[in-house]
Amino acid sequence: MTMITDSLAVVLQRRDWENPGVTQLNRLAAHPPFASWRNSEEARTNRPSQQLRSLNGEWQFVWFPAPEAVPESWLECDLPVADTVVVPSNWQMHGYDAPIYTNVTYPITVNPPFVPTENPTGYYSLTFNVDESWLQEGQTRIIFDGVNSAFHLWCNGRWVGYGQDSRLPSEFDLSAFLRAGENRLAVMVLRWSDGSYLEDQDMWRMSGIFRDVSLLHKPTTQIRDFHVATRFNDDFSRAVLEAEVQMYGELRDELRVTVSLWQGETQVASGTAPFGGEIIHERGGYADRVTLGLNVENPKLWSAEIPNIYRAVVELHTADGTLIEAEACDVGFREVRIENGLLLLNGKPLLIRGVNRHEHHPLHGQVMDEQTMVQDILLMKQNNFNAVRCSHYPNHPLWYTLCDRYGLYVVDEANIETHGMVPMNRLTDDPRWLPAMSERVTRMVQRDRNHPSVIIWSLGNESGHGANHDALYRWIKSVDPSRPVQYEGGGADTSATDIICPMYARVDEDQLFPAVPKWSIKKWLSLPGETRPLILCEYAHAMGNSLGGFAKYWQAFRQYPRLQGGFVWDWVDQSLIKYDENGNPWSAYGGDFGDTPNDRQFCMNGLVFADRTPHPALTEAKHQQQFFQFRLSGRTIEVTSEYLFRQSDNELLHWTVALDGKPLASSEVPMNVAPQGKQVIELPELPRLESTGQLWLTVHVVQPNATAWSEAGHISAWQQWRLAANLSVTLPSAPHAIPQLTTSETDFCIELDNKRWQFNRQSGFLSQMWIGDEKQLLTPLRDQFTRAPLDNDIGVSEATRIDPNAWVERWKAAGHYQAEAALLQCTADTLADAVLITTAHTWQHQGKTLFISRKTYRIDGSGQMAITVDVEVASDTPHPARIGLTCQLAQVAERVNWLGLGPQENYPDRLTAACFDRWDLPLSDMYTPYVFPSENGLRCGTRELNYGPHQWRGDFQFNISRYSQQQLMETSHRHLLHAEEGTWLNIDGFHMGIGGDDSWSPSVSAEFQLSAGRYHYQLVWCQK
């Protein structure tokens, strides 16, 4: 044990938090989570241990702007100004100090290992009692599961130790410091330390004791560590559970270790042995260790599909069977290896349906509770994810247990990121920083290696490629050869990774960055000498309204076996709740706390909002990742299972044939598909229909029974095909009265029955409509070529730094947002059965023509207005965001009914999950409440739209809400939006894709850009 004076002044003078060679003082060695059961049955059933006591709850807390500001008396007694805070928590969520959101830029001046003198410091204290029996024998430990970023610990006024690494436990022996009766803990937590230079992750920078604190009492002679691993024969019919156990204390001949393996109530295998490891060299072996091998016949294998869990109980006892203590862990029999360029689990090539997940809660910051963790896992499973990357640090210990039991593959990542360094490997190539990096990697492995869900180790994130990475890669491969190691830094294919693991590499497009080119994923596989699998550690940047082009990745994954999937960036929006002056909550992002530097809304890249409400993009991910694929040939549906291990024993295939959303025939068929097998389903012959409508076949895979992660009736997969229908002839309708045209100096007015249409002759726009005496428009019907910018349109542009390559900057520079209409033509003609209005406009900016729009409005005797639009786009202007029409309707109706793709928001490059049907939703559901307002709510492939008294027919895309594009564009946060008068309707003949390969460079694929130059579309507007 390191001994230094207990004096606070001496501790402050030492400044351990500015010395990369001091990562801990008196911290105990890492190990798997312990409970020190004194009853093996309680260990087997994982009952709460009487030897493990939580110290979570109310602690005394004082915040100071620097560590030197606290008086020495704090070590002995609480300060008068002390507040009460809950542990675990981040002190910023209690109003102390400000959270800082920054992606790359360090929140402090870069001068490693030094940190600012003004270093916000939290002083925690807790008074507690200890059971007297704990003082009489054994060892009492205190465990801090997570403290950000570094801390010193005192007990009863005496200094105990020091720890850093915010995301792994720091554990200390308190035995020599405790006394009978009351005891007092004092913890000095520093916001910044030299460790902060290794924790430059894209997240909120927060501080405090944010994970659990507990006391653990272990016997004097104790289990110090244990490690389990599984080995198999070639066909996985026989396995060996290898358990290595290390003890601490007096090594006596009578000591024994028994390892028993349980499946529920049934003991599968057991073995007992004395201590004494195998001979390593001429000096012998480890006297304090023992390795046991338990043979298991026909083990039930673990996978994310079928997470079969056994329980291993490790007992330390005497030769006569007297139990000293027991530890236990869940066990999954599974094998991970790379062979022939493929990542295999139990001999089968994996397809990683993964997502990156930060530990984030909108109210609690970086504090995770079991309910939130389970909620995340259930949502992931329900949306066909099978893997999660712990980005970018080891997670709460409970997370891994839950992943073991529910079934998720885990990439466990070391808490190392130096993204803001120039160059990035400035520290990771520096041997002075190897000890700090080493502790972050080795302790992660030692804590988490018993978890079957952990299938890959990661050396960290965005830290370049340094010699320290190579050393740590070799250490892991030596200590744990059962798992591959991945690391993206330095180009994604360095010597420190077993897997090519790029971030944001595109499917077909090379990105030729200096020194580290980012090849297309297809090309990467074929580089000379390259034989490794490729799994994207990050892809499909889900920031705001995004995930366009996601289907292209999944087409490639299924086409090329060595493209084994990837991890979407990322799971949850990192917005935080603030309250306005009236106590109303609102969602905040970077800069909203006065934090500088900050990266604005770049913290919100989730597939779900911070409260775990899904984004529309989550449905697209679910559909592309679904485990059943379908092929239609005639009346035959071929279903292929992508499950590797699971028989489809809880699935029904439900099919429906519908004409314009009206079901004509349906049935359901039990599914019985073997893993990686096929099932052929024959549909009955359907009558040939003569119809002008659209005939669609839709199949859904439904789970009739509830599972551990889904309710009964859960839909896991679906597909839709348009069927051929006989042509039909629409008979002419009976003659109608002819609309009457009235011309004045200012307007053309057309009247029919109780309806009127007014076209302004000076503007050339439809300026008003009446039904009876009620006006229908608040603004004229005008062309629209812009959208409220998406995050993907904005890229890295901001007020002080403009990216001229960003779509929004190109549109602004070209004048798309400022374009004004100049009338070329506005004429009216009375035809035999209709009135025809013909208009032409140029849309100009600073004398330059950007668009020419020609329209005809044909109003016939039935009251229908057929609108034909032809648009020319100037060859030297950027491709527009949309080509459509917009107006502000006077009515506010409760519901929207449409025949088209839905029900969720969809865009031209993100619509594979949408189905053609007749949908009916509340108006409020047509708006997607992205925290940073933008273009939202589009529905594509629409044939008919009904809203209030109006109906539109044609082939178009639309969005409809209470918010104008102008308001969306000018508003920084969703809570600042106000419902405008009436309803804004946007009807597009064409709409650009949204992109999403990344959010900092234009990523809309060429096929989804509006590059044709000439566009033509039609629609009919009538009143029901």
Swiss-Prot record:
The keyword Protein transport does not apply. The record marks H358, H392 as: Transition state stabilizer. The active site is at E462 (proton donor), E538 (nucleophile). InterPro entries: B-gal_small/dom_5, Bact_Beta-galactosidase, Beta-gal/glucu_dom_sf, Gal_mutarotase_sf_dom, Galactose-bd-like_sf, GH-type_carb-bd, Glyco_hydro_2, Glyco_hydro_2_AS. Substrate binds at N103, D202, E462, E538, Y539, A540, H541, N605, W1000. Binds 2 magnesium ions per monomer. Binds 1 sodium ion per monomer. Homotetramer. Belongs to the glycosyl hydrolase 2 family. HAMAP family: Beta_gal. NCBIfam families: PRK09525.1 (NF007074). This is Beta-galactosidase.
